[in-house]
Amino acid sequence: KGTFWVNNVNQYKRLAICGGIYSNYLALQQLLEKCKKLGVDTIFCLGDIGGFGPHPDRCFPLLRKGRVETIAGNYDISLAQERKDCDCGYTDPRDNYFAQASYNYTFAHTSKENKVWMKTLPSQQRFLLGNLKVLVCHGSPRQTNEFLWESSTPNHLLEKFAVDYKADVICCTHTGIKWHRTLAHNKHFINVGVVGRPNS
């Protein structure tokens, strides 16, 4: 595993990382335009392309044209596998009610072609940012729909992820709320937030 980081990963100097697009193609357009002006090497999207917004199929051409490196979120996996729900991981019945309504709409308005494309998405990706070993995923390195809240996630769990996955920086999304924590040995855990919904 030690040589994995040296021989088999891409290396970047400047990049952008975002979370859920949630069918908000207008927000995605703005992101792509801003990244072009900033001259980033590449853009990573950490999953959940569809959901909540009205036009999921308008996002996919933008992702492809922008050559956005996309990770599979729980929404993408469920749509690709034609599951009955989004596998969001909610425990509150009210959240599940609205999530189901959103998923049903997104499923009906996502083309077969795009569902097939989502089957090709990886669950995580590794790369070098300068000398830093970076791992990007959706929920956590161990589970796509794991909620890691800033208020309740202990340092020792995040530090264990850094050790187990040999990463200096781990980036995720899923909760939709951005936060950053510096850990022991100058490791970092970052929730990048989302593009397509308010930060709440």
Regions found by a protein language model. Name each.
Residues 21-22, 49, 53-55, 75, ...:
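Gly/Ser/Thr-rich beta-alpha loop segments that engage phosphate groups in nucleotides
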